[in-house]
Amino acid sequence: MSTAQRRVQELEKLILHHQDRYYNAESDISDDAFDALWEELARLDPGNPLLKAIGSDSQRDAVKKRHIVPMGSQHKAADEESFSAWAKKNALQAFLVQHKLDGVSLELQYERGHFCCALTRGNGIVGDDVTANVRGMRGFVPTLTAEWGPCGNLPFTGGVRGEVIMHKDIHRSHYPTHANCRNTVNGILKRKDGRGRTHLHIVCYDAVPGTPGKPFTGSLPFADETEKLAWLARQGFVTVHSHRCANAQEVVALRSEIMRTRELLPYSIDGLVVKSTDLDFQDAQLPRPKKQIAFKFSTQEAITTLRDVQWQTSGVTYTPIGITDPVRLAGTTVKRANLCNPNMLTKLCLKIGSHVLISKRGEIIPKIEALVSTPAHAQEIHIPTQCTSCNTVLENSGSRLFCPNVNCPLLSHHRITRWIECLEIKHVGTELIQRLFEEKKVRRIPDLYTLTCEDLIEIEHVGNATAKKILEAIHHKKEIALQTFIAGFGIEGIGETMGEKLICAGFDTLEKVLHATTETLESIYQFGTELAKSVVTGIARVKDDMCELLDRGFVRILAKQQAESPLRGKSFCFSGSLRNGDRATIHRIRALGGVVRTSVTRDLSYLIFESLSQPYRTAQKLKKEQGVALEIISEDEFCRLLDQASASCTHTGETVHPLQGKSFYFSGASRSMNHKHAQEKVRALGGDVASSVTAQLDYLVFYSQSTRYRTACALGIQIISEETLHKLIATAQSPLHTDAHVHAPLHGMSFCFSGDLDGMTRAQAIALVQRLGGTVKTAVSTQLTYLVSNDPHGQSRKCQNAVRCGVRIISEHVFLALCTPGT
């Protein structure tokens, strides 16, 4: 038997097992994970009989009855490409889009207008009779009015289809120990005593005339799906939320909007049902109707195969990273997944070849969550026992695999890299650090400041000009905040955020930090005994290097904040993807004495929100349940707060230059100021003048479309005109108060791209728009500002939709001009 055949057999067993758990017990995997198993079976064995079967929710001792029309399943689309292919194949005139309710399917049968019985899906042909429980549910209608037949005066005989759901607030208050609403509904439906049935709602979406086995007999009082929903509503049924879309692009746009706001719904949905607006009786009787599809939300979980485990080093810590077969997850292709620590390998019983469930819930690297199955030929995972750098025997505490050697080269290298990252020293990349470290030119942080041009020129591909640029970048950062200084030494558990906590707790000078004890540190909020010990031990090991940096004048620690700093004592947390919530904003807050937090806690001052994300909901909960004095403000309110703080700084004489931390490259010949004069002004205002275009560049000052101009476009670097540079320089008279439109020239604009671009890829164009404050849409709608297309004839579907919607179509050249204000 081949490997593929063995996998097919394994998939059959898994699917049958999870179908039974789904309908008759607590489901032990997510819908996304089950769909992944189904799709894998369809790929390996398209003709497998199991793919044509329908799962059963039947109980063996329940009374069985036949459906009026078989309850089939639906085709599924997990992404825009799959949905667009389905839409193109079926060429429907219009689309009816409905919430895909996450509940239990139900058929209510009526005879001459009177309720007879209620059936679950069962095996699709016959279902369990749950009549007694349904009578007590919300939304149940016992008698229908005489609105049937050619004259509209006959009582209805047939079935009404719907979904039994539970609202999320009911689930939270009455069934907190149950996994989810659907599992709870399934359990209540099958109770013989009817307990809990009043907590359930019936939401309807279909009506089928006829009798069991003889569907669609008799005339209809409606002509299409929209009129059907109206008829159901007139009868007193609660109907599913529906929306009519003219084309596939509108469906995609609607899905994106609902994905953003679905947490506000009182019930759970896991996608949308998209169907034809026309009635088609023959199609409705198919096991999987062709003219409707379940348009699922972006997959957050998937099943794949673990092929290898690589051990990634961060300092002296070894972290396992799982290498898997490629799988689509939340709109991206995933091949690497985090395994956290050796404990996870043991806990999940993982082996090379295991089928695993991975998730991606906002994390950059997806995480392996669970073991699905392990084939017989799977191999054990090798856990390293010796340090790859110093050959010291590694210590495995379960939660961490690490080298205990305090003089391990890995630790020294990590500290140097961390220092470069914290100080944001440009032009010193990981490859250069590695070469300097290997050639023993830099083995400690102070060694960076004793480098000479000759040292650097000896490194391959480093010339005299580059060497000077590197040295200038290293020595440019002279004054450093205390929390940055401490974080730069890579002490385990201490980044800038925890450094700020130290300062807020009274350790606001290096001398106080150096003399801190475990007992004094463990009393600080979010510091425990272990972290306190780690900090004290780590500080002791790097104390000499810290003192050398300061004693030799390589760097200086900024004087501690004065009490009059306008944001002193205030802390901020950002929720969602703010258009201005970038690194420059964080620097601006810190320059004014404020603190930036990564999570919502009791002592937070402000939450700046753009969307109803998890931090927003946590903040609301803290305010409501614990009476926390936390202000939740919009981004516009936040900007006004910063402006007021900036004005306060101006009155007190405190200045923070608007070009601090910004880098510029000058392209072409200036019309009104020579390069040297412009560069002097930029440097005087705290900016940095770059000699080449790299991904780290902030601005390219545009005079002509040189090669470097095109390189900057491709890298997504903001391109500004000479006039815009004048505006930036002029803001020096009003420190920190910058014109939002200078930094975000596309603010308030939305763009959609059609076809290929000449000067950059679509991904680069999207990155450029987002960097300049604009938004990117995947479909054309009346809310769109511009459609970017190089099609001179406007024959694409997006161009045609733009014409119908009154959206302006612009070329790539005009698009680049918009990205370059002042030209």
From Swiss-Prot:
Entry annotation: catalytic residues: K100
Q: What does this protein do?
A: DNA ligase that catalyzes the formation of phosphodiester linkages between 5'-phosphoryl and 3'-hydroxyl groups in double-stranded DNA using NAD as a coenzyme and as the energy source for the reaction. It is essential for DNA replication and repair of damaged DNA.
Q: Per the record, what are the reactions this protein catalyses?
A: NAD(+) + (deoxyribonucleotide)n-3'-hydroxyl + 5'-phospho-(deoxyribonucleotide)m = (deoxyribonucleotide)n+m + AMP + beta-nicotinamide D-nucleotide
List residues of the BRCT domain. Answer: 562-655, 654-742, 741-823
Q: Which PANTHER family match?
A: DNA REPLICATION REGULATOR DPB11-RELATED (PTHR13561), DNA TOPOISOMERASE 2-BINDING PROTEIN 1 (PTHR13561:SF20)
Needs which cofactor? Mg(2+); Mn(2+)
Q: Which GO terms describe its molecular function?
A: DNA binding; DNA ligase (NAD+) activity; metal ion binding
The name this protein goes by in its record: DNA ligase
Residues reported to bind Zn(2+): C387, C390, C403, C408
The top EC class is ligase
UniProt similarity note: Belongs to the NAD-dependent DNA ligase family. LigA subfamily.
Q: Which GO terms describe its biological process?
A: DNA repair; DNA replication
The UniProt entry, under InterPro entries, shows: BRCT_dom (IPR001357), BRCT_dom_sf (IPR036420), DNA_ligase (IPR001679), DNA_ligase_AS (IPR018239), DNAligase_adenylation (IPR013839), DNAligase_N (IPR013840), Hlx-hairpin-Hlx_DNA-bd_motif (IPR003583), NA-bd_OB-fold (IPR012340)
Residues given in the record as NAD(+) binding sites: D31, D32, A33, F34, D35, S73, Q74, R121, E163, K275, K296
Keyword terms of this UniProt record: DNA damage, DNA repair, DNA replication, Ligase, Magnesium, Manganese, Metal-binding, NAD, Repeat, Zinc
Q: What is its EC number?
A: 6.5.1.2
